[in-house]
Every structure is written in C-alpha cells, then in structure tokens.
C-alpha cells in the first residue's frame, strides 16, 4: 500500500549524494497536493528527483504522478503535458524496478493497474509514438521486469 504520510528526515537517508539532497530540498515536508503543480508543469524534472529518492519518500511522492495521470481527476484535466507525464511515470517504474526494486516492489500492486491503463490508452495521454515510443511495449518490459524481481 502506498505510504500516506509525508516522509520525515530519517526517511530520506542521505548517503551523501547530491541527488537525494536536491530531492530533499524540493520535496521535504510538502504534501502530494503541494507537489502536484510542480509535477504537472515539470514531469521530467520530477522524474529525476523521484528516481533518486529512498524508499519512503519515493513511495509517498509517486502519488503525485498517480493523481496527475488518473483520467477522472481535475489534475489530469488541467495537465498541459500528459504525454511527458505518462512517459515519465512508466519510465520511472522501469528505472526503479531495474535499479532499486526494494523501493518499488512493496507498492507495485498500487501502480501496475494505472501503468496498464496508460499503456492501453496512449492516445488519451496525447503521447505520440514518434516522440514517446510505444507505451504497450514499455508495459511489456515493466511486466517482465516485475516478474523477474519477484522470482
């Protein structure tokens, strides 16, 4: 289940990396609601921050993408760059499964249905294949990688 509590200082476990420190400075102490405008306007930057976050912050702030990409949400209706946001979400899942599976596996059940929906509704997200590639093909990779991590 996705973490519903704003991460605290000990959850960030810096390990002395600049990437985590930058993510901390941008996200620390902020709610999902507070971060939605940033993720909506800068999905590629948000991807970069979330990709390097430790488990608890990642498991909390991934909700910004989930909320933004839910086609029934107001945030989705207001998002100007749905294609980039959807591509970043799918790519972020792929990155975490490949590089930090321990961060994402506990919440994969909460993410996989949205990932599948996005992959089968690429046009809804205004994501041209020529620009973003094939979401169905990326979803196949995600499913395979998820299965491999669970074995």
Task: State where each predicted segment sits.
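Classical N-terminal secretory signal peptides
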Residues: 1-2, 151
């Amino acid at each position: 289940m996705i973490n519903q509590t704003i991460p605290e200082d000990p959850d960030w476990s810096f390990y002395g990396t600049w990437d985590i420190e930058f993510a901390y400075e941008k996200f620390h102490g902020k709610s999902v609601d507070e971060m939605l405008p940033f993720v909506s306007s800068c999905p590629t930057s948000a991807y970069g921050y979330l990709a390097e976050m430790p488990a608890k912050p990642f498991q909390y702030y991934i909700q910004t993408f989930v909320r933004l990409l839910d086609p029934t949400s107001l945030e989705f209706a207001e998002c100007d760059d749905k294609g980039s946001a959807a591509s970043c979400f799918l790519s972020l899942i792929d990155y975490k499964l490949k590089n930090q599976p321990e961060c994402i596996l506990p919440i994969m059940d909460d993410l996989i249905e949205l990932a599948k929906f996005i992959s089968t509704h690429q046009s809804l997200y205004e994501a041209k294949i020529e620009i973003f590639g094939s979401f169905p093909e990326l979803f196949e990779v995600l499913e395979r990688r998820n299965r491999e991590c669970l074995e």
